């Protein structure tokens, strides 16, 4: 299912262009749309990518006779949501189902695994000071392992999953603060996790956005106001959709995976366990 060496051919596709999408989908049996953004940039707006882009892929897939479509959305997708991100995700879902009623919609929570942009990002931040600042410290998340998510996508792409919307989350939920403490325990660092109040975060985000705009994109956009709105809402399943249990997939706990890829952020890296063992021998 993951593709043997030499059997995967990467091709360019601009999901804002009908001809590009049609060329990519021509002759396909299934399509999996994983395209999504967390921040808007130029013409790559939430609507352009997550709503209109999803509509274009589904419409052309139907026209090309593609049998199965899997569309990645996100837990919290809501046409009346507080963030542009969540509303664009919901709009994309609606368009996909309009053109491909038999599509499988996957709504994951925060995804973790090697090279993820969640635990890796904050583990890297923890290297540079005694304080780890976060926005939405008490917001609940239920992280899902990337391999479990991939297994769900395979079932959808091969027609082994029933059509519908699946909210996919791991076996454990925790607050943002709790997840950071788990991560710090894995990388063996002691840091003070400080929750930034929402009103302060909104001011910070507005400042970042202004700086980004005035420098024509040179200044980094560390936080946006839309992300602050997203971080004010729990990111856990509603219980109103299908789930991993309907796919027969047993979910993976964070503790069994995090240490496999976060060890480079330990003070002694790969030698941390050896040093700890040697210290115990001396005592």
Predicted regions and their residues:
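Conserved beta-loop-beta element that borders a ligand/cofactor-binding pocket
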Residues: 73, 93-120, 124
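NAD(P)H-binding glycine-rich loop region in Rossmannoid oxidoreductase-like domains
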Residues: 2-64, 75-81
């Amino acid at each position: 299912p993951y593709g043997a060496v030499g059997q995967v051919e990467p091709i360019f596709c601009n999901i804002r262009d009908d001809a590009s999408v049609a060329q990519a989908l021509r002759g396909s049996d299934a399509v999996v749309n994983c395209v999504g953004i967390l921040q808007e940039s130029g013409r790559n707006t939430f609507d352009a990518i997550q709503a209109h882009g999803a509509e274009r892929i589904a419409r052309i897939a139907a026209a090309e006779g593609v049998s199965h479509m899997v569309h990645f959305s996100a837990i919290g997708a809501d046409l009346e949501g507080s963030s542009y991100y969540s509303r664009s995700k919901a709009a994309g879902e609606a368009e996909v189902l309009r053109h491909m009623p038999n599509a499988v919609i996957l709504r994951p929570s925060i995804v973790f695994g090697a090279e993820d942009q969640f635990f890796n990002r904050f583990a890297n931040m923890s290297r540079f000071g005694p304080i780890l600042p976060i926005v939405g410290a008490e917001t609940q998340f239920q992280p899902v392992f990337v391999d479990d998510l991939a297994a769900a996508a395979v079932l959808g792409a091969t027609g082994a999953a029933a059509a519908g919307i699946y909210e996919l989350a791991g076996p454990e939920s925790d607050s943002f603060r709790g997840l950071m403490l788990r991560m710090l325990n894995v990388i063996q660092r002691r840091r003070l996790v400080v929750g930034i109040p929402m009103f302060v975060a909104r001011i910070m985000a507005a400042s970042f956005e202004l700086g980004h705009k005035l420098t024509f994109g040179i200044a980094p956009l560390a936080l946006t106001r839309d992300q602050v709105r997203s971080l004010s809402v729990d990111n856990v399943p509603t219980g109103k959709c299908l789930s991993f249990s309907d796919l027969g997939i047993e979910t993976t706990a964070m503790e069994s995976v995090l240490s496999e890829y976060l060890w480079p952020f330990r003070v002694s890296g790969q030698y941390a366990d050896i040093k700890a063992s040697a210290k115990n021998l001396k005592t």
